[in-house]
């Protein structure tokens, strides 16, 4: 799948600013007893990334999380969050 992501841009220190964006992939419909997601790597696949002449990705990492929410403290949900 190919995803598009939009992040809030803060340009206080333009043109020397750095932005941080996150993309969280997971399910709220099915818990970890039904759906297990595992990243292939902690580095996202950027093969379909479209470069920009205005900025570059300096670093990209991903982490898997086992999360519980206030509504359902005994139910665990998995997600993978990538930070750019």
Swiss-Prot record:
Disulfide bonds: 7-21, 71-72
Catalyzed reactions per annotation: K(+)(in) = K(+)(out); Na(+)(in) = Na(+)(out)
Pfam family, one: Neur_chan_LBD
GO cellular component: postsynaptic membrane
Glycosylation sites: 20, 66
InterPro entries documented for this protein: Neur_chan_lig-bd (IPR006202), Neur_chan_lig-bd_sf (IPR036734), Neur_channel (IPR006201), Neurotransmitter_ion_chnl_CS (IPR018000)
Keywords: Cell membrane, Disulfide bond, Glycoprotein, Ion channel, Ion transport, Ligand-gated ion channel, Membrane, Postsynaptic cell membrane, Receptor, Synapse, Transmembrane, Transport
Membrane topology: Multi-pass membrane protein
Single GO molecular function: extracellular ligand-gated monoatomic ion channel activity
Signal peptide limits: none
Protein's cellular compartments: Postsynaptic cell membrane; Cell membrane
Positions bearing the site annotation: Confers toxin resistance: 66, 68, 73
Main location: membrane
Record note on quaternary structure: One of the alpha chains that assemble within the acetylcholine receptor, a pentamer of two alpha chains, a beta, a delta, and a gamma (in immature muscle) or epsilon (in mature muscle) chains. The muscle heteropentamer composed of alpha-1, beta-1, delta, epsilon subunits interacts with the alpha-conotoxin ImII.
Biological function: Upon acetylcholine binding, the AChR responds by an extensive change in conformation that affects all subunits and leads to opening of an ion-conducting channel across the plasma membrane.
Similarity section: Belongs to the ligand-gated ion channel (TC 1.A.9) family. Acetylcholine receptor (TC 1.A.9.1) subfamily. Alpha-1/CHRNA1 sub-subfamily.
The name this protein goes by in its record: Acetylcholine receptor subunit alpha
